[in-house]
Design a protein with these regions (language model features):
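C-terminal amphipathic alpha-helical interaction region
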Residues: 1-73, 116, 134-164
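Conserved mixed alpha/beta catalytic, RNA-binding, or beta-rich assembly cores of soluble enzyme
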Residues: 46-107
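Phosphate-backbone binding interfaces of nucleic-acid-interacting proteins
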Residues: 84-91, 99-103, 108-164
C-alpha cells in the first residue's frame, strides 16, 4: 500500500501575472486552508467470530470505478471515519486481486495496487490488465470498468457488532 500525498505547497509555488512582456510577482498569504478530518486508528484487538458481524462493503463505503486504458481504477470511500480501519484491513491488494481474478490477466497472479488517500477516508485500487484491452479494443460486457466499483461493494467485511 502506498500513500498519495499532494506535495506542492502554496508557499513553494511562485505566482506571477504576465501583462504583455512584463511579469509581476504576486504575494498570496498562505494561512489557513483545508484541514483533513482525523482518521480512526487501526484496530488492535483480535475479535472472535462471535464478536463480529460480516456485512457487504456497501454498508460501510461508497465506490466509483472506471478505466485507465486496459486497467480498471476503483475508489472506495468510507461512510464514517471509524469504518476506514476495517476497510483497510479487509481490502488488501491480495483480497481485491482474488476477488477480481476472473477479469485479471493472469487470474489470481494478476497485479493489483492500492493507495491510501489521507484525509479523504478513501482507498484507491488499480487493477492491471483487467479490461480485455479496454474501450473499443475489448469484447467484454464492461470494457471501461464502470461496474467494478459496484461489484466490489458486495465484498464481505467483518466488523465488531457494536460498530454499526
Amino acid at each position: 500500500t502506498r500513500e498519495y500525498l499532494p506535495t506542492a505547497q502554496l508557499t513553494q509555488v511562485p505566482i506571477e501575472v504576465v501583462v504583455g512582456e512584463q511579469r509581476f510577482a504576486v504575494s498570496v498569504p498562505a494561512s489557513g486552508g483545508f484541514v483533513p478530518p482525523g482518521e480512526a486508528a487501526e484496530p488492535t484487538e483480535q475479535l472472535t467470530p462471535s464478536e463480529t458481524v460480516t456485512v457487504p462493503l456497501i454498508r460501510l463505503a461508497l465506490a466509483r470505478s472506471g478505466d485507465k486504458g486496459d486497467h480498471a481504477n476503483i475508489g472506495v470511500i468510507a461512510r464514517k471515519p471509524e469504518y476506514l480501519p476495517y476497510l483497510r484491513a479487509a481490502l488488501t491488494t491480495e483480497a481485491v486481486r482474488d476477488y477480481f481474478a476472473h477479469v485479471l490477466a493472469g487470474g489470481s497472479a494478476g497485479k493489483v495496487e492500492r493507495w491510501t488517500l489521507p484525509g479523504t477516508l478513501s482507498l484507491n485500487f488499480l487493477l492491471h490488465h483487467a479490461l480485455g484491452g479496454g474501450g473499443a479494443g475489448s469484447l467484454r460486457t464492461d470494457p471501461q470498468g464502470k461496474y467494478f466499483g459496484q461489484m466490489l461493494l458486495d465484498y464481505p467485511v467483518a466488523v465488531p457488532r457494536g460498530l454499526l
